[in-house]
Amino acid sequence: MNFLNKMERKIGKYAIPNLMIYLIAAYCIGFVIYTVNPNFMLMLTLSPYHILHGQVWRLITWILMPTDTRVFSLLIMALLYYQLGSALERSWGTFRFNVYIFGGMLFTVIGAFILYGIYAAAGTGSLETISLISSLTFTTNYINLTIFLAFAVMYPEMQILLFFIIPVKM
């Protein structure tokens, strides 16, 4: 029995069913926050400099960062990733899908700190400025892209309609 199966037996009951609904709700909340006060979103980004200076809420709130700031793009993204994420959750199981998503989030945070450490060791520019610029790139966009990739690997013969018209094979 492999490690993931052992973990599922021990802590599988804590897995969050329909995790994509919660993620999409977080994106929508982030979009509303961005629409109401765009400057406040800078307080929610994944910025290692600010985390190391006491703003620990950023370890969680970066998940609220919308991948796009247009309403139509948000709707399309929400529909697409809900379908893809739900299909992956049904085929993998709730626990494994949770491990996939939360693992992606954890490694995004680790990657942000590694990049911050590299910039700090190189001594190029102000760390606060570098952290601010790089924090805008640490969003859940890459996690969403891995969902798309995982779906394409699981269902290579599936087609989606690009712009609701053009069929594209995975």
Cite the ranges covered by each PLM segment.
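A detector for small-residue-rich transmembrane helices and their helix-helix packing motifs
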Residues: 1-170
